[in-house]
Amino acid sequence: MEPPVPQSSVPVNPSSVMVQPLLDSRAPHSRLQHPLTILPIDQMKTSHVENDYIDNPSLAPATGPKRPRGGPPELAPTPARCDQDITHHWISFSGRPSSVSSSSSTSSDQRLLDHMAPPPVAEQASPRAVRLQPKVVHCKPLDLKGPTAPPELDKHFLLCEACGKCKCKECASPRTLPSCWVCNQECLCSAQTLVNYGTCMCLVQGIFYHCTNEDDEGSCADHPCSCSGSNCCARWSFMGALSVVLPCLLCYLPATGCVKLAQRGYDRLRRPGCRCKHTNSVICKAASGDTKTSRSDKPF
């Protein structure tokens, strides 16, 4: 019985590994014609995939320059690595692969945390420390009204040439007797109103208001005892006949005269300005440092 003939006459090296593709029993005969490749064990490389973010976070992935269209391809530069960050391929074949990979990941995580951690607060020096507080500046509001007249010429600067009193509108206007509105601002309480109601003249005014023409009702109702205007004789005749029934109407004229006298006396006491008529006015100029006034020589 003959010994079996070996399929390959190549001696087997214990330090080498035969690498051949898996053959399927149903593969065609042409695939069996490829030669077998024998690689020594020191030339074999592992399929370890490096992660630049974990293994070496300080190095950013370098992007290769763009190749111009139609030109030869350029090789991307390989980023420089430190000796401490190089991961050898033969480490995975050692007896402790899990311990080496875990230590590498731990050191990479520590370097990543150290890189991302902010510097201590004590080492951060401010560019410029504020030692003095800003001063408060009090700004005056802008005067948008324009230049105003001097205080001594603001008002009361027109004086009468005869009596020397002020001739401004506020001082020269006549002063009336005090009056007020009563009954929910419906009735005026004044001296003349009290005379009208006390002497029953309000009744006569109401009759003239409703019985006269529309053109004359205003003058007749407001001034029933006037000697001018229309229907003067008719008005006085009617009031004379009515005074027989209402004798209080006879007191209307004396009471109205008393109100006029009281108005003049009150105006003389309360009006501070000039009461002269047809007199010239002069401009009062205040002397500097003195409260007395001096009159100008140019009246107007």
Swiss-Prot record:
GO terms for molecular function: protein kinase inhibitor activity. Coiled coil: none annotated. Expressed in the embryo and adult tissues including heart, brain, lung, kidney, and skeletal muscle. The modification N-acetylmethionine is found at M1. It comes from the Eukaryota. PROSITE patterns: SPR. Induction: By FGF signaling. The Cys-rich domain is responsible for the localization of the protein to the membrane ruffles. This is Protein sprouty homolog 4. It comes from Mus musculus.
